[in-house]
């Protein structure tokens, strides 16, 4: 049995039109700005090195009123324009029939996710839905992926995503699990009190590999590699953001599948992007 985790935008749902309209309506109504092209909007949202608010509106951060306006636009346009990709519902039913634990891990606000999935008719197929909020940081932070794995009875996990942020979250999550396994874990110690070394706002450069080709991930006070010994900083990577025991993650593994039916752009770190048929074959058992 497996845990299968899905990103939402660009993986489950084609929401590119909804996002385009929301951004451009906000530009027009609040700032009197001309519309942006959809491709530019989508690329910016998927780029972990971009400040989307600065790129879209010329400001480094939003006021509460500005955020409220955008979120109202976002929810309304999702309802009207976001649709499941062709073949996704059949894939989800097949996974469910095979007994897999299904989850969503999305950077969309957590309070909007269930309504969006209900609207498309697939909410009932998911065992767990996780979105970003004050306690759960957005990808490329791996916290929501680790949270799903800790809650699932199946510790072999596959994450399907379409963007650089998804890929980096999976890379960081796999690194965390590998280092936890090397160190032997710390049974009974809550991840929520395991340390405060995570740099949740870390930005990634264009090349996230070391000189020897090994994937590297930087945390406050430590830079670890897939070939390096485990460190306390690595073990504390996602500690502050979810309630689980280290024992719940012992022996877990995380694989990433880059998909191509969405609107993201495969990065140079990923394998070739996959079709739904190819994803089904790799997931197996369905």
Name each model feature, range by range.
Residues 33, 41-45, 76, 80-83, ...:
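Pocket-edge positions in alpha/beta enzyme catalytic cores
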């Amino acid at each position: 049995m497996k845990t299968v985790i899905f990103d939402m935008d660009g993986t489950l749902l084609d929401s590119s039109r909804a996002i385009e309209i929301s951004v451009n309506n906000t530009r027009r109504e609040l700032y009197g700005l001309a519309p942006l092209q959809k491709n530019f909007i989508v690329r910016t949202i998927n780029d972990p090195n971009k400040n989307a608010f600065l790129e879209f509106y010329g400001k480094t951060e939003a006021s509460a009123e500005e955020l409220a306006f955008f979120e109202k636009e976002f929810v309304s346009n999702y309802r009207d324009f976001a649709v499941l990709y062709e073949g996704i519902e059949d894939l989800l039913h097949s996974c469910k029939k095979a007994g897999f634990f299904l989850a969503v891990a999305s950077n969309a606000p957590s309070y909007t996710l269930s309504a969006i999935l209900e609207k498309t008719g697939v909410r009932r197929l998911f065992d767990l839905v996780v979105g970003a909020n004050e306690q759960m940081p957005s990808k490329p932070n791996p916290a929501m992926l680790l949270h799903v794995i800790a809650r699932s009875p199946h510790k072999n996990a596959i994450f399907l995503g379409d963007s650089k942020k998804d890929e980096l979250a999976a890379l960081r999550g796999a690194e965390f699990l590998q280092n936890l396994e090397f160190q032997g874990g710390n049974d009974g110690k809550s991840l929520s009190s395991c340390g405060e070394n995570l740099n949740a706002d870390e930005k990634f450069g264009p090349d996230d590999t070391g000189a020897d080709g090994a994937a590297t991930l930087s945390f406050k006070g430590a830079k670890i590699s897939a070939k390096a010994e485990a460190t306390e900083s690595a073990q504390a990577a996602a500690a502050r953001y979810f309630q689980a025991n280290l024992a719940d993650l012992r022996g877990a593994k995380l694989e990433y599948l880059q998909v191509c039916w969405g609107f993201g752009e495969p990065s140079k770190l990923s394998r070739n992007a996959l079709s739904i048929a190819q994803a089904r074959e790799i997931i197996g058992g369905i």
